[in-house]
Each structure stands twice: as C-alpha cells, then as structure tokens.
Amino acid sequence: MNGHFFISKLYDIMTCKKEYKNMKLQLTLNSLALILCCGDLIPSSTQPISTQEWQGIEKKLKSVHKEPSMITGMSIDTLTQIIGLDEFTAHKIEKRQKLLPDLFYALQNLENQDIGVTTIYEEDYPASLRVLGTKMPLVISYIGDLSLSYGVNISVAGPQMMNKTMRHVTKEIMKKISKEGYTVVVGGSKGVEELALRTQLTNNGNAVLFVADHMFDKIRLYSKYIKQNKLVIMTANDPYALFDVTHALDKNLYICGMVFAQIVTGTHIGSGPVWFTSIQNIHSHWTRQLVYETLDYSGNIRLIEMGEAHFTDEDLKSEVTLAEILDNHETVIKKDDPSIDQMTIFEFIEETHE
C-alpha cells in the first residue's frame, strides 16, 4: 500500500463539523493511522498495536522527522531500515494496513449512529486525560456534547449494594455538587454511581458517563439527556464491546484523570474496583480523594488512615464547599511511610465484599 492511496482514501472520511445531530467525523490523518493500527473498532483476528508499542513507534518516527500518518503507507523495508522498527512490529503494521477498508466501514457505521471518535492527535481530545501521560487512552468514542467533559469535574464512587444510610449520603453529596456547579463523571455501575448520575441529570446538571462496555445500552437508557446536551457518554473501547475486567479497571483510571477529586462513599478492603482504584490512585496521584468517614466500611477507615481527605455528615449539612472540605481534612503522608506498600501486599487480597 502506498502513501498516495492511503491519503486519497482518508480524504473520503474527512467531512465537516462534529455535532450530536447528524454526526460527521472529522479526523486528521494522524488520528486515522492511529485508529487503524491501535484501535479495536475493527473486528479482526489481527491484534492491534498496544499503547506501549505505539509510543515506541512514535519516538522512532520523531527521530527521523516523520508523522504518524506516514507509517501506514510504508513497506516493511522502510519500517525496519529507515524508521528502525523491529521485524515483528513492522509485520504487525503491515497486517493492520490491510484493514483500511474495514476501518472506513466501521467509522461510517459509527457516524450513522451519531457516535463521534477522537484521538490524542485531535484538538477536541479532553485535556484532563493528558495528565495520565502514557496511561491516557489513545482513542475515545463518544455520543453527545464532548465539551461537557472540559469543565471542572468530580466523580462519585461507592458500593453497588446500597443501604439506607449510603443512599442518604449519596443524595446529600449530590446536593452539594449541584449547588457548586460541578460536572459529575461516573462509570455507570449500579448503586452509588447510578444514583449519582440520575440525581445529577434530574437536577439539570451536566454529567459524563465513561463506560467500558455495553455503550449502546446506556445510550438507549439516557437518550433524553444526550439530546438535551446534559450528558456525554464516552468509551475508550469499541462501542460494541462486552464486559472485560481489564477494560473496567482502565475506565476507572480514566475517570480519575478527568476529575479534580473523587468522592468515595463506601468501600471494603479488597472488595472490588472502587477499592482497587482508590489504592492505585494513592500510588499514582491521579487525583485527590475525599472519603466518607464511617465505621461501616473497612476500606473507608483504611483510606483515611493512609492520609486521604475525609468528610462527615456535619460537613454535608454545612455551607463549607467540597473544595474547602478537601483542604481542611487532608493529611500529608511522609514519603517513607511504609503503610501504603504494606497495605497493598497484605490487605488488598482479603476476601471482603462490598
């Protein structure tokens, strides 16, 4: 496949402005090359290039002053001898090149269903995700007004099984969030996240639903709010994807990157995604965490012991803002404090369930 053929084909997919109604995809050549090589939009037995592999390819291309788009029209000899890629990677790229017609079909199909696509090479890619560095998703599919994700965001996470107290706490948190004008970012799990999302939308607030699977089910469920430009649904995976535990955990990481703070209403030690993400967040410093002070959840107790900011029922009733609560209740943990590493080794594997 030569470069002229690739560019002429890419031109066919580049159209006008993105909008929810009659979505028209507008993607740069670099983005299309990235989606072709790394995206999972194309059903194929040919494995996509991993994020880590792509980052290595980018470095090689930059060293010889080449754009990512040029890689798709290169032969194996050019990829190995001029770009400096190894034979294995070059052959993977060659196999992906042959999927170009399938890519156009997949993008056209998404466009017909008002699904937009953006990548790290596009100006509309959410800037907040770039704080994740090498862990940020390369490709995002979405429906709705993507600019909803550009504001000051906050996430709410907690157990999927709620008791009366947890339901009350979540509703009180949402009152503060609504009053302070934040955009809520959630992952769509049942329980606390679902309640937070529905409450935010009912209160006419803005929301981002970042999912890892079953995107079209969520679109049907929340189509009213998408049309009202109050909700954008996003995914870093194929919109048709089914549940995958790795994708689910990655999605939680992306949510952390998008928000200035994550509110944890309840989690037990070693219990699941909320606990696992909270611990990862402590290690990686993706965002600040605000944990509900309660004796009912072992994970909450441990997170607060480890220095995470906490809030009480009195805080929820007060006029103090969430940002002020974060500042007032945050503890600084010394770098040589061994408790974090000890916890992840011994406590994370406990079989407590939310």
Please provide the spans of the model-predicted regions:
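N-terminal amphipathic/basic-hydrophobic helices that include classical n-h-c signal peptides
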Residues: 1-22
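Intrinsic disorder/low-structure terminal segments
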Residues: 4-5, 53, 87, 310, ...
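Glycine-biased, small-residue-rich flexible motifs in mid-sequence functional cores and linkers
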Residues: 16-48, 74-75, 113, 119-354
